[in-house]
Amino acid sequence: MIEVPDYIYERSVIKQLYLKEESRHLFQKNAYSVSISGGKEDAQFFAEASAVLTFKENPILKEEDLNDILRKLMCAGGSLEEMRVEIVFKGGFIESELRQFSSSLKQVADWLGAQIIRVSVNLCDTGEREQTVFILGSGAIKSASEAPWKRGKLYAGQDIILTGSLGKYGMTKLFSENIEELRAIYPEPYIEKLKNKRADRLPIIETDTAAFYKTTAMVPLGPGGLLAGLWSLGDREKTGLMVYADRLSYEQETIELCNHFNLNPLMLDSKGAYLLATDMGEELVYALRNAGLRAVCIGRATEDKKRVIVFDDEERFIESPKYSY
């Protein structure tokens, strides 16, 4: 793998980012530069999150491509302030594609209010033609009064709140990957309804609301669904969990597709849904619902180490994650 020449880097990265002259020294192709952002003067800790994207052609960055980074930072009590980016061109290099990428990176950074600290470009002649983008986002963690969930603590007796819809993201993936099969089963109005489903959602309402209701943890769900999220939360804090299946929130289409493909909705990718731990479950649920968000108290943390989901009179243990989609 080789680096892109300086003259290409200058015209297809630097110029596309419209960098001021005093900012150009921040860019290094071989190593991370020192951040000059620093966040708030009293900030002592930073949160970091990364994402890897792959493009087969036209590597144009969109705002939603950074959602995984944004949600992790928000759930850690931070916000995106700085971005460090590396793009690797495999199987061939077209300079116009680098220009397009740099321009789109600038637009996304401006939209998010983030500072681009580093852009590294590398070329690899071997392999199938594609572009791989590595993005590292970071930002100062807010104070405990602004983001009390930043420590990610869970205490016995606390309520566990679920926001969003379980398995919705995995359901939309199932639909897009099996649309022709589903057309033969479901009527066209149903298919059109599924086409318009949008699952990925950032915890904007949660972070705007949670600080007022003694929220001590906020966990983004994703691959492995609810079971993976519950396991991670309980295992990290060595706390038991009692969750009630009849309180869980799904959309009807999620249940129908899980039945068709014989999948467990509790394990379906639930990106866009979140778990919150709070001392004020009823009040937090009420506030979130008033803000237009689907929210429900699904259970509580317990003193013993047992982690179970209650189905009628049967308790099923929450096991170490295995995920689908």
What residues fall within each predicted segment?
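Helix-biased detector of long, well-ordered alpha-helical tracts
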Residues: 1-325
